[in-house]
Amino acid sequence: MVTYSMIPQISQAPGLIQRVLTFLETLKAQGFTGDTATSYADRLSLSTDNSIYQLLPDAVLFPRSTADVALIARLAGEAAFSSLVFTPRGGGTGTNGQSLNQGIIVDMSRHMNRILEINTEQRWVRVEAGVVKDQLNAYLKPFGFFFSPELSTSNRATLGGMINTDASGQGSLVYGKTSDHVLGLRAVLLGGDILDTRPVPTALAENLAQTPTPEGRIYQQVLTRCREHRELILEKFPKLNRFLTGYDLRHVFSDDMQTFDLTRLLCGAEGTLAFISEARLDITPLPKVRRVVNIKYDAFDSALRNAPLMVEAQALSVETVDSKVLNLAREDIVWHSVRELITAIPDKEMLGLNIVEFAGDDAGQIDRQITQLCARLDTLMTQQQGGVIGYQLCDDLDGIERIYNMRKKAVGLLGNAKGRAKPIPFVEDTAVPPEHLADYIVEFRALLDSHGLSYGMFGHVDAGVLHVRPALDMCDPHQEMMMKQISDEVVALTARYGGLLWGEHGKGFRAQYSPAFFGETLFNELRRIKAAFDPHNRLNPGKICTPFDSEAAMMQVDATKRGSYDRQIPLQVRETWRGALECNGNGLCFNFDARSPMCPSMKITRNRIHSPKGRATLTREWLRLLAEQGADPVMLEKKLPESSLSLRALISRMRNTWYANKGEYDFSHEVKEAMSGCLACKACSTQCPIKIDVPAFRSRFLQLYHTRYLRPLSDHLVAGVESYAPLMAKAPGVFNFFLKQPWATSFSKTHIGMVDLPLLSSPTLKQQLSGHPAMNMTLEQLEALSETQRAQKVLVVQDPFTSFYEAKLVHDFIRLIEKLGYQPVLLPFSPNGKAQHVKGFLQRFARTASKTADFLNRVAKLGMPMVGIDPATVLCYRDEYHQMLGEARGDFNVLLVHEWLHQALQEREVQVTSGEAWYLFAHCTEVTALPGTPGQWQAIFSRFGAKLENINVGCCGMAGTYGHESQNLENSLGIYALSWHPQLQKLPRQRCLATGFSCRSQVKRVEGNGMRHPLQALLELI
């Protein structure tokens, strides 16, 4: 390794092909209204999906309409660009690399997300390809409908992606696959022709086949080939609920051959035939009644073998989860929401779970079905048969949704397994006849056990589909080879049971096994159909099949994987930067719902770079490129000088910064741009199934980045807020006067990069508490108190935001403590260091944290509760202090207001609720780290006879100083408008309460008047 005093410049990145650049320039000149992206960061962010593969595209296009897509296809048809290839992409949730390729990626998800038309009488809806599945269902719900094909990634998977993989999931035994609900498609052929598909009489299809157009050529080829080989198709295609797609030759014709539909061919085609831009979808009435029975087993095999009983009971769906997934769920935040719905059985170990749903419009019939099932289960338990150890009923819609959210998170939870080997997708969606599933799984498990692998299992046993993810370390070349060996063995095993390798998630890189399933004759028919649509193999080449007479190669299962890049990073670096390296691409951070706290920067920009997955992807590549140059970031971190910057280092940074401002390339700048967009809200550290803590590795990156480049002045001001705020508070009138001057605000915005700075409290906290006993106790006096005297004390831990900018709130808290019969003591202000951590001043943060931890540990020995008001700073003591100090942090505990109140009011009886309700807007960092927060606040208010409703919102957009930085102002206000503003417009402002200082500041800035803290409402109630 080379010894560095700063990170090296990473000046080389994979270059751009001139023909690609010319194509993009011509496209713009011809009126393309979408976005184009060619930076290395942009290309990297779309080089992976939820699979193990990695392929770097040459460029990315984000069309805004079908017209844009047609323009792309038309220009691509010109001879000058005949060498370019194109791949459509949706939500990027594919598990087998379906949308990964070189060439140009056409991403439909960013802009093409409009719901265009609905007809409730005829029960259909027309959408663009980028609409997310849950987005559509949220739109349909007020009409009483839903789009029934289900999948675990429904909050970020696009309908275009679902169509291209013919996705299905829970409930498919009743609802079928996506293709069963697609009434018609608008597709764009390479060359720019529009193809509108729908079921048509075969006679009309034959007439269309005679037209001298690309559409006619397609109709001619498909009609001829599918009719000629009809008997072979019916013989070869398994008669499974999860029928064979890509290409679905069987369903192009109706059973009586009187109807013909190209739609069925495009469904499951993975973008290899055309660009799908719009779809007309069948919609299903929402069932009036839903019931779930959670059945618990002593073994996973028992759960599998008991599944036919559920199918006989006419259940809508049967979802099975094994003990590995259950144990991972128990360690995740999601378990908080379901633990009362899936309780433990005394003296029994739950090693399997069947989630059985009944749904329909006849409540009486469903109740009878459940009663009969429960009677069977009781008999099995009495006779100690079938491995049934207990069951629970749930008829609450919210509870049912929480159960399925846990099940949906199972995929990601497996990625959070401990150790270097991680459960990965490559044989995860095999389908066999349901009656053979249990025996098949016995052999499957024996196969994996023979390789000494651990694995997790869950899935849709009613449909014969079980998701199996063997744990492999893909940084180990030997285990990478084992992955291919296991794939081959599972292909053979599945064939023996009359099943499919691809029962649910599409083929992707696994299409190399297609000839074995289809046979040579039918596989060649697939190739002829590919040739009719895409004769020169330019649409997602290498997937499904290659055109007939083409010598082009198929993608291979053992193609380039993420692990082959990650293994180039030294092991020590991989271990210490685990947060970035362990992202498995599950994409939960792409959740479309504005009320979901993760990830606000992704929600407002719709740019994958500005997501936890994007930032993790860029960081792992940055670490790899550092390793290429012999730079060890771990060693560099250890050698950072403790003292101030030397003159030589300062001059070097000034020179590097000057060249950077002149446009000198460094990949580190692209990573820095991604990190600068992060709000450091920490939602990812709890909401992500893998617990990818972006703020943690972001602060490390910033520290290293600024060994080479100067920091902006605003960074120093933010990091020093806890030093200068106490000094400014000595003369708030003077500083507030200057802060209000137009020239000062203009100077701050233009030269410092800060806007809308808050005013200092006047009168100050010290003035408001002048003469109050809370101000007059020293630590020594506290230590001298007797046990009886200490029992009445409550110690208030100050933070810089409420103490110096919201002093009245601190004063009100002290008054509340007194009214509850306790004696408040305001501890001396001791810097928290949160702002230093956010900006990557980690050495300063370590010193601050060490000093404050020593102080708080000394106070903690007194045995009196310590309580802080601002969630972000209090939680910093629990999280960042642990990360930085380890065991040296000690065991002090600072409670949040609601935590202390919840304890202090345990003996107080709940009073009869009366009066108008209050509305709680909880701080996003607080509610993700402590999901019980809203419920505890509600319990507290109930003890004073007040009703408190929790308002489900995402981030407010302020996030400490993020919203005060000029470069973030537009996004900050945009994030606020996503969920906070609409909710506040519906509610009486004076009854709305917010726990976060940042949240209250943002509301005041945008709405003109602020919100109060819940404790201030309690003060009013007492």
From Swiss-Prot:
Annotated residues for binding of (R)-2-hydroxyglutarate: 407, 505
Report the pH sensitivity of activity. Optimum pH is 7.5.
| Domain named FAD-binding PCMH-type: residues | 53-286
Q: Which PROSITE patterns match?
A: 4FE4S_FER_1, FAD_PCMH
Organism this protein belongs to: Pantoea ananatis (strain AJ13355)
> Where in this chain does the record put each 4Fe-4S ferredoxin-type domain?
667-700
* Known cofactor(s): [4Fe-4S] cluster; FAD
Q: What does this protein do?
A: Catalyzes the oxidation of D-2-hydroxyglutarate (D-2-HGA) to 2-oxoglutarate. Appears to be the only D2HGDH in P.ananatis, providing the way to recycle D-2-HGA produced during L-serine synthesis by SerA, by converting it back to 2-oxoglutarate. Is involved in the utilization of D-2-HGA, that can support the growth of P.ananatis as a sole carbon source, although it barely serves as a good substrate. The physiological molecule that functions as the primary electron acceptor during D-2-HGA oxidation by YdiJ in P.ananatis is unknown.
InterPro entries found in the cross-reference section: 4Fe4S_Fe-S-bd, 4Fe4S_Fe_S_CS, FAD-bd_oxidored_4_C, FAD-bd_PCMH, FAD-bd_PCMH-like_sf, FAD-bd_PCMH_sub2, FAD-linked_Oxase-like_C, Oxid_FAD_bind_N
The UniProt catalytic activity note for this protein reads: (R)-2-hydroxyglutarate + A = 2-oxoglutarate + AH2
> Which UniProt key words apply to this protein?
4Fe-4S, FAD, Flavoprotein, Iron, Iron-sulfur, Metal-binding, Oxidoreductase
Describe regulators of its activity: Activity is completely inhibited by the addition of 0.5 mM Mn(2+), Ni(2+), or Co(2+) and partially inhibited by 0.5 mM Zn(2+).
Name of the protein described by the UniProt record: D-2-hydroxyglutarate dehydrogenase
Q: Which GO terms describe its biological process?
A: lactate catabolic process
Q: Name one GO molecular function term.
A: metal ion binding
Q: Does the keyword Flavoprotein apply?
A: yes
Query: Which EC number(s) does UniProt give?
Result: 1.1.99.39
- Which family, according to UniProt? In the N-terminal section; belongs to the FAD-binding oxidoreductase/transferase type 4 family.
Query: What positions does the entry give for [4Fe-4S] cluster binding?
Result: 678, 681, 684, 688
Instruction: Identify the SUPFAM superfamilies for this entry.
Output: alpha-helical ferredoxin (SSF46548), FAD-binding/transporter-associated domain-like (SSF56176), FAD-linked oxidases, C-terminal domain (SSF55103)
Following inactivation of the gene, the phenotype reported is:
Disruption of this gene leads to the significant accumulation of D-2-HGA, and thus impairs D-2-HGA utilization.
| Assembly | Homotetramer.
Q: Does the keyword 4Fe-4S apply?
A: yes
UniProt temperature dependence? Optimum temperature is 45 degrees Celsius.
